[in-house]
């Protein structure tokens, strides 16, 4: 909307203490733009988010990275994102470290964006869609494990991904026997992303074949 940046300026002037402010979605009634790391707290937040009239500014644990305001004055190190991530979880990692350092993360109902989602050069090209899906599946799983290993511990991360790891392996075998290449690749690349992360290899997949 035309007044979006006016709202940004107004919001910043009113809230000097913020570290991160995330925007909300203008047309999405399924996916949350923010939440909490604590499961019980997040489930309650999710249950009420689309029902209740939201405050202009809600204090949360994390916001999605599609549209964020970041107050760099609050960060001593201006290189705020962990470069070990290639895709996914960078914003959750930043929000987690912000919380751990006593910072404030907010979600604003005044700032609305239309998030297209996975509409980059790969995702929007039908000829490259399969490659894009492989890239997405691989890095989502790699980053998922790395996030929990970094911010909690290795054993907790293993616990979080164990079901996904074995499910991906078994479904990869299952769809191989069915000669279903699309679903086989889906679970193959999820399995590989997790495997690389679990054994400590970098998030280096850029579209190469592993088989």
Residue ranges and their predicted role:
Residues 1-79, 92:
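Acidic/His-rich active-site region of diverse nucleotide-sugar glycosyltransferases
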Residues 3-11, 93-97, 142-146, 168, ...:
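Alpha-helical elements of Rossmann-like donor-binding domains used by nucleotide-donor carbohydrate transfer enzymes
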Residues 7-10, 73, 77, 97, ...:
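Residue-level signal for well-ordered alpha-helical scaffold segments within enzymatic catalytic domains
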Residues 21, 33, 156-160, 185-186, ...:
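Short, hydrophobic secondary-structure boundary micro-motifs
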Residues 59-64, 68, 84-88, 133, ...:
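Aromatic-acidic/polar surface patches that form glycan- and anion
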Residues 61-67, 76-107, 111-114:
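Donor nucleotide-sugar recognition loop
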Residues 100, 104-185:
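Active-site-adjacent helix/loop segment of glycosyltransferases
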Residues 182-211:
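Membrane-interface aromatic/basic loop that binds lipid-linked glycans or pyrophosphate carriers
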């Amino acid at each position: 909307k035309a007044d979006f940046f006016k709202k940004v300026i107004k919001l910043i002037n009113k809230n000097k203490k913020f570290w991160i402010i995330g925007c909300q979605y203008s047309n999405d009634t399924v996916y949350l733009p923010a939440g909490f790391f604590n499961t019980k707290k997040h489930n309650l937040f999710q249950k009420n988010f689309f029902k209740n009239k939201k405050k202009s500014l809600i204090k949360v644990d994390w916001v999605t990275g599609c549209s964020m305001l970041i107050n760099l004055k609050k960060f001593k190190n201006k290189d705020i994102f962990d470069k070990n991530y290639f895709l996914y979880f960078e914003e959750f990692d930043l929000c987690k470290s912000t919380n751990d350092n006593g910072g404030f993360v907010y979600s604003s109902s005044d700032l609305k964006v239309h998030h297209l989602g996975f509409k980059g050069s790969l995702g929007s090209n039908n000829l490259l869609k399969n490659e894009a899906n492989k890239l997405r599946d691989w890095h989502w799983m790699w980053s998922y494990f790395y996030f929990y290993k970094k911010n909690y511990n290795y054993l907790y991360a293993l616990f979080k991904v164990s079901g996904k790891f074995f499910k991906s392996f078994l479904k990869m075998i299952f769809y191989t026997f069915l000669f279903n290449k699309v679903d086989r690749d889906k679970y193959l690349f999820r399995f590989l992303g997790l495997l690389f992360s679990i054994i400590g290899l970098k998030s280096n997949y850029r579209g190469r074949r592993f088989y």
